Amino acid sequence: MMNFKMKNKTLFLCLPAMLNIPFGGSSAFGANSEKDNKENSPKRPNVLVLLTDDQTFSTIHAWGNNEIQTPNMDRLVNQGMSFTQTHVMGGLNGAISQPSRAMLLTGRGLMDVHRNGQVIPKNEKTFPELFRENGYTTFGTGKWHSDKAAFNRSFSTGANIFFGGMHPYGNEKEEKGHRCPYLHEYDPTGKYKNGQWVNASLNTFSSELYADAAIKFIETNASNDNPFLMYVAFTSPHDPRNVLPDYGRKYDSKEITMPKNFITQHPFDNGDLNERDEKLLPTPRVPEQVLAERANYYSMVNEVDVQIGRILDMLEKSGKDDNTIIVFAADNGLCVGEHGLLGKQNLYEAAV
């Protein structure tokens, strides 16, 4: 059992430490009486989980990339603990984020998650579900890549919920991508039949909508002593990379260097070269096009960094920051030119 001293803000960049939080009371984590726990146990910490989509490890300034500016992710690095040897186990199809999120949520390995993570059965507890069962208010916003029933078992409330893998292409509305996500409000029945397209003319962005929901939850619970767990799952920097000028910094391809392991075309067919990711640019890859794609990718990372900063600032303003454990992670990485690839359906370092 870990005893967290939260007088000074404690931040973690990986999940294992969070799962050792003593819940207190009649929890299986301790055998003391309820009276003893109330008198002797520290105040139970809040937990904020921030999850980005397709963000490779080398896109954080504090970890040595001087081409990108990520001041709020840097705050987490500089004030917390970084786990630099964690890897994604891949997947059984092209949607790597689906099993990776299911693995993170359940603690199970790739071959043990149900249907590649598409469904999380009742007998496979998620960590938000465990927190909820032990008295935490659990809140979810953003991407949920498994079934709706598992979401409702995990969270007692939520807002701006995106069920699915990515903001798709196809028709005029969908091609606006992050500017026009299809979102749901929390439905206690679990049916979620009344989702709505966000009006693209509002010139908002998916990350802002998820941050707005998180900020509103913090504001609403500022005076509430009951501990909470927040799960904020961004859909950025996953493509389509149509970030608006007002959201973060726009990078110029002239500012970006090509990765040393860039080649114009992968030397052999690994079985996944026809995935949608790999069709974003034609092969053989033209260096100028890859640099432009990397510049857009960096812009998306910077955009989500701005929204993370808004959440951290509100947490501090609420006075909850000194008793909140923050976990920041990505579901998987991404190749953006490395080895001639543009996807994550491989086991190269940038993708895992």
What are these regions, as identified by a protein language model?
Residues F23-V352:
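Formylglycine-dependent sulfatase
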Residues M2-L13:
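Bacterial N-terminal signal peptides that target proteins for export
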Residues L13-G24:
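Bacterial N-terminal signal peptides
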